[in-house]
């Protein structure tokens, strides 16, 4: 680039730094500088699953199943699913991809009686939300979202093909069926460089003093 455009190394470095700040390129340690993937814009305005979100954006969603097994519920999982700490729940780990690019590492926790049914299906092609609602008649009525910026643990980094310590969005989502019954608790780790979340807020009328 220096020879082609007849500029100094300092000028090239500053230009690349500017492109990184603008999110147009990314620097990968030991590999070089690459054009950045365009960010997926995801609205947090209704309860939807990954497949529904990506299809709405014209992306091709796929999944890679890493694990599905019964594990003892820790205090957090037990609280979210309203079960006793230490009781067995189903944990399902998947990598979610859009157009072949890893977007999210998902950990899904289900009550044992539901989870043992869900894992008998092909979870690389059948969305869990669809199975719950259409196969097992468990309509998802509402969910609670908790969004946090965190750094990738070695496990998350390996799943998403990023460096440990890279920024990721962590969404904790508890979905409820009828009578406010929690049936699905998820920890969704999204690559921070590939997604942007937006929402719309309305202001409640205030009483005039």
Segments (PLM) and residue ranges:
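All-alpha effector-binding/dimerization core of bacterial HTH-type transcriptional repressors
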Residues: 37-209
């Amino acid at each position: 680039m220096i020879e082609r455009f007849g500029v100094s190394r300092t000028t090239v470095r500053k230009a690349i730094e500017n492109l990184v700040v603008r999110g147009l390129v990314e620097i990968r340690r030991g590999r070089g500088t690459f054009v950045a993937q365009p960010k997926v814009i995801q609205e947090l305005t209704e309860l939807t699953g990954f497949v529904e979100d990506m299809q709405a954006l014209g992306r091709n969603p796929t999944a890679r199943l890493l694990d599905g097994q019964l594990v003892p519920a820790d205090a957090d999982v037990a609280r979210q699913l309203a079960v006793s700490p230490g009781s067995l729940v189903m944990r399902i780990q998947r990598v979610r991809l859009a157009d072949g690019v890893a977007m999210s590492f998902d950990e899904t926790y289900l009550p044992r009686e539901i989870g043992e049914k869900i894992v008998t299906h092909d979870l690389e092609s059948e969305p869990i939300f669809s199975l719950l609602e259409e196969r097992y008649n468990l309509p998802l009525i509402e969910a609670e979202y908790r969004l946090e910026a965190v750094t990738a643990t070695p496990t998350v980094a390996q799943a998403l093909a990023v460096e440990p310590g890279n920024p990721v969005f962590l969404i904790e989502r508890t979905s409820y069926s009828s009578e406010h019954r929690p049936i699905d608790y998820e920890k969704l780790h999204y690559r921070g460089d590939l997604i942007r979340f937006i929402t719309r807020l309305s202001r409640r009328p205030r009483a005039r003093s």
